[in-house]
Amino acid sequence: MKKAVCLLSGGMDSTTLAFVAKKMGYDILALHVNYGQRTERKELEAAKKVADVLGVVEFLEISLDYFKKFGASSLTDMNIEVEAGVLGRADNPNTYVPFRNGNLISIATSYCESRDGEAIFIGVQSGDHTGYPDCTPRFIEAMQHAIYVGTQTEKSIELLTPFVMMNKTDILKEGMELCVPYEHTWSCYSENDEACGVCSSCLARLKAFADLGMEDPIPYKK
C-alpha cells in the first residue's frame, strides 16, 4: 500500500484533506506539529481524535520551541493580541507565522523519506493566498522543486495540495460527502475551550457552514 504523510493540525482543511488522501488509497502517516501556538493543547487533542477516526498507520507528534522565541506573530507571541478577523482582508494579518509552512513541509519531507512514503499532503487553500505567502501555489511549486533536489528516494516524493485553488465552503462540501467528523476539529486561533467566533479562522469556518445552510458542531463563546 502506498503511504503519504498528512500534515494534520486538527483544523477543517487538514482534516478534510487527510480523508481525501485516504480515499485516494494512501495509508496515512499523520504528522502533527506543536510550534508554541496559543491553541496547541486543543489542536493536538483534535488531531488525535481525527487520527483515531481515520485509522492512521502512525501518528507522529513533533514539538518546536523556536517559533515562540522568534515571536512576530500573535499565534506564538502572547504579547500580541490576536486581531479580529475581516473576511476578504487584503493586507498582512498578524496571525502569519514567518515561514511556518516551509518548516512544516521540510519536517514532513524528512518523515516521508524515512518511511519510504510517496506523497505529502498539506491543506493550503485559496483563502490563505493573501497575507500568507507560504500558502500560495508559487510557494508550493518552489518547495516541490526543493524536495525533488534534496531527497534520495528513487521515486520522487510528491507535494500534493488538492485544495490550493478551493475555498473553505467547497472544502466543507467535499468533507461532508466523505463524512468528515467536524465536531472533532478545531480552527480558532485564540481559544482552547470555546471558539472565539471573531478571529479570521473562526469567521471563515462559520461562513463555510452558513453557506451550506449548516450549523457548526463545535462550541462558540456566546
From Swiss-Prot:
<keyword id="KW-0479">Metal-binding</keyword>
<feature type="binding site">
    <location>
        <position position="202"/>
    </location>
    <ligand>
        <name>Zn(2+)</name>
    </ligand>
</feature>
<comment type="similarity">
    <text>Belongs to the QueC family.</text>
</comment>
<dbReference type="GO" id="GO:0005524">
    <property type="term" value="F:ATP binding"/>
</dbReference>
<protein>
    <recommendedName>
        <fullName>7-cyano-7-deazaguanine synthase</fullName>
        <ecNumber>6.3.4.20</ecNumber>
    </recommendedName>
</protein>
<feature type="binding site">
    <location>
        <begin position="8"/>
        <end position="18"/>
    </location>
    <ligand>
        <name>ATP</name>
    </ligand>
</feature>
<keyword id="KW-0547">Nucleotide-binding</keyword>
<dbReference type="GO" id="GO:0008270">
    <property type="term" value="F:zinc ion binding"/>
</dbReference>
<dbReference type="Pfam" id="PF06508">
    <property type="entry name" value="QueC"/>
</dbReference>
<dbReference type="GO" id="GO:0016879">
    <property type="term" value="F:ligase activity, forming carbon-nitrogen bonds"/>
</dbReference>
<keyword id="KW-0067">ATP-binding</keyword>
<comment type="function">
    <text>Catalyzes the ATP-dependent conversion of 7-carboxy-7-deazaguanine (CDG) to 7-cyano-7-deazaguanine (preQ(0)).</text>
</comment>
<dbReference type="InterPro" id="IPR018317">
    <property type="entry name" value="QueC"/>
</dbReference>
<feature type="binding site">
    <location>
        <position position="196"/>
    </location>
    <ligand>
        <name>Zn(2+)</name>
    </ligand>
</feature>
<comment type="pathway">
    <text>Purine metabolism; 7-cyano-7-deazaguanine biosynthesis.</text>
</comment>
<dbReference type="InterPro" id="IPR014729">
    <property type="entry name" value="Rossmann-like_a/b/a_fold"/>
</dbReference>
<feature type="binding site">
    <location>
        <position position="199"/>
    </location>
    <ligand>
        <name>Zn(2+)</name>
    </ligand>
</feature>
<feature type="binding site">
    <location>
        <position position="188"/>
    </location>
    <ligand>
        <name>Zn(2+)</name>
    </ligand>
</feature>
<keyword id="KW-0862">Zinc</keyword>
<keyword id="KW-0436">Ligase</keyword>
